[in-house]
Amino acid sequence: MFISVALTTCKGAGDDKNGVIQFTDIMTANGVHNTNLIRNSGIFTCEHPGLYLISVYIQSYQLQNVYYVLKNNNTIAEGYSSLTTSVTVIQQLTVNDTISVTGKLYVYGRNKSCLNILQIQ
């Protein structure tokens, strides 16, 4: 049975970040039951295996910033920018695979920095 997963979660208040970026403002969470884990740790844990589209956009005031999209703590994408940048990847996820975003940069909050995860198959 195909279970559709759709998640949009954005950064709360802006702050300097060195490590996992916490996206605390959950806007959409269809098919996701572990929303407290995402809010508290910034880590998405896959509950339903499938093919996923993962999209991240980050806004920062720093002229040279970098962030990493991680699957099970391994880099699957990197974003470099002087103000706003986005990264989109497609990944096969199995149950308990994790997705997180890390970096050492100032991250603007609200809808200026968000993580989107969509199960496409």
Q: Which residues are covered by each model-predicted region?
A:
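Extracellular jelly-roll beta-sandwich "head" domains, especially the C-terminal globular C1q domain
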Residues: M1-Q121
